[in-house]
Amino acid sequence: MDQTLSEFGNVFVFFLLGVVFVAGGYLTARMLRPSRPNPVKTSTYECGEEAVGSAWVKFNIRFYVVALIFIIFDVEVVFLFPWATVFRQLGSFALVEALVFAGILILGLVYAWVKGDLDWVRPTPSVPKMPEMPASKSSSQRD
């Protein structure tokens, strides 16, 4: 138990030192740098050219879906690398756990595929045509 606490203590000390170094560097730079605000410094920079149009561009939602799926599988790899390093010590139960984990993510990928979120060019939905209504009989033709 004492060894576990000392290992967490080491991690905490490294975390604390990292925060102190980052905060110290930030505060030192903030105190030493000159402050000369200028409207040119806040303008949009496009490779040395004057900006044309608005900097706000609408992106298609498909980019978001592809990026989200990429992040999900990237995180999966982050979880599977440590598992792969200790696979021999964990035994077959760990293999089953990893397969279940990967299977759940693959089910999500199949769901996104079947739903059509991975199709880049989607067919445009066709609007069904209304059937022609028969001409109504005039009141003089009714019995």
From Swiss-Prot:
Its EC number is 7.1.1.-. It is a multi-pass membrane protein. It catalyses: a quinone + NADH + 5 H(+)(in) = a quinol + NAD(+) + 4 H(+)(out). It is found in: Cell inner membrane. Keywords: Cell inner membrane, Cell membrane, Membrane, NAD, Quinone, Translocase, Transmembrane, Transmembrane helix, Transport. Pfam families: Oxidored_q4. InterPro entries: NAD(P)H_OxRDtase_bac/plastid, NADH_UbQ/plastoQ_OxRdtase_su3, NDAH_ubi_oxred_su3_sf. The chain crosses the membrane at residues 8-28, 63-83, 93-113. One of its GO terms (cellular component) is NADH dehydrogenase complex. The keyword Cytoplasm does not apply. One of its GO terms (molecular function) is NADH dehydrogenase (ubiquinone) activity. Its main location: membrane. The keyword rRNA-binding does not apply. Belongs to the complex I subunit 3 family. NDH-1 is composed of 14 different subunits. Subunits NuoA, H, J, K, L, M, N constitute the membrane sector of the complex. NDH-1 shuttles electrons from NADH, via FMN and iron-sulfur (Fe-S) centers, to quinones in the respiratory chain. The immediate electron acceptor for the enzyme in this species is believed to be a menaquinone. Couples the redox reaction to proton translocation (for every two electrons transferred, four hydrogen ions are translocated across the cytoplasmic membrane), and thus conserves the redox energy in a proton gradient. This is NADH-quinone oxidoreductase subunit A. It comes from Chlorobium phaeovibrioides (strain DSM 265 / 1930).
